[in-house]
């Protein structure tokens, strides 16, 4: 076997191990770190098949860095398929909507029906196609309504707005932003769509897409959770 083939095999093994490690970290909920971070509280992250990868993985690790235990919940406790959503920047035929591609996998460590929302200090609703059908889950609606009623901090990005909208969390003219094609989900459920990268209205912090994660979106969400903890 020549040197070139050996190098190629070695590179393949390294890449495979790297991807496996990333999947393990996501699937385990960063358990080792989280055991040390429980003093800051737990943040619930509902997901399902077709949850957007960037929407989800960045906050998963970012909030853990702030000392929070990020608990991934789903309809059942199993691995879920994430996807990548992107409008192709260079295409011979223009796209008017995002193209969907397969992404990583992430494990839900608790089912919606077993979630006790009073145990959590914050709720993070990510995007992708998953919210389109997750909003029909009665247990997820029960969970989301708890955060709305108790005025606990809620962060939402992109299509995640469909979940809080379905739970009645935008009634009374609450201001929020989202990806443009979800604007009606805000307006038709009593909210006010604001065409800005990120918006704050009380306990609700919203961002249009993951492209807006470079705003004070995360700092504000974390600040609100810390404020809530001392009340």
Write out the residue ranges for each language-model feature.
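Short, thiol/selenol-centered motifs that function as redox-active sites or metal-ligating centers
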Residues: 157-160
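Active-site-adjacent substrate-recognition loops and nearby beta-strands
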Residues: 179
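Bacterial N-terminal signal peptides
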Residues: 15-26
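ADP-ribose/adenylate-binding Rossmann-like module
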Residues: 153-155
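Bacterial N-terminal signal peptides that target proteins for export
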Residues: 4-16
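Extended, subdomain-level signal for the structured scaffold at the beginning of enzyme domains
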Residues: 31-150, 162-175, 183-231
């Amino acid at each position: 076997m020549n040197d070139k083939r050996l190098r190629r095999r070695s590179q393949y093994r390294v890449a495979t191990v790297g991807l496996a490690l990333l999947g393990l970290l996501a699937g385990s909920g960063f358990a080792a770190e989280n055991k040390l971070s429980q003093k800051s509280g737990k943040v619930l992250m509902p997901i399902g098949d077709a949850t957007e990868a960037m929407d989800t993985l960045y906050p998963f690790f970012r909030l853990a860095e702030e000392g929070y235990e990020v608990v991934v919940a789903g309809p059942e406790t199993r691995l879920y398929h994430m996807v990548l959503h992107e409008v192709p920047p260079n295409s011979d035929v223009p796209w008017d909507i995002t193209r969907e591609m397969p992404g990583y996998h992430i494990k839900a460590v608790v089912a919606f029906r077993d979630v006790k929302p009073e145990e959590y200090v914050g709720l993070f609703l990510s995007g992708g196609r998953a919210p389109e059908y997750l909003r029909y889950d009665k247990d997820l609606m029960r969970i989301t309504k708890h955060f709305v009623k108790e005025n606990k901090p809620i962060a939402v990005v992109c299509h995640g707005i469909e979940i809080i909208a379905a739970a009645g969390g935008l009634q009374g003219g609450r201001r929020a932003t989202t990806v443009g094609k979800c604007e009606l989900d805000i307006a038709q459920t009593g909210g006010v769509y604001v065409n800005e990268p990120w918006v704050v209205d009380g306990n609700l912090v919203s961002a249009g897409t993951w492209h807006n994660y470079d705003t004070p979106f995360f700092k504000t969400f974390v600040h609100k959770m810390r404020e809530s903890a001392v009340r």
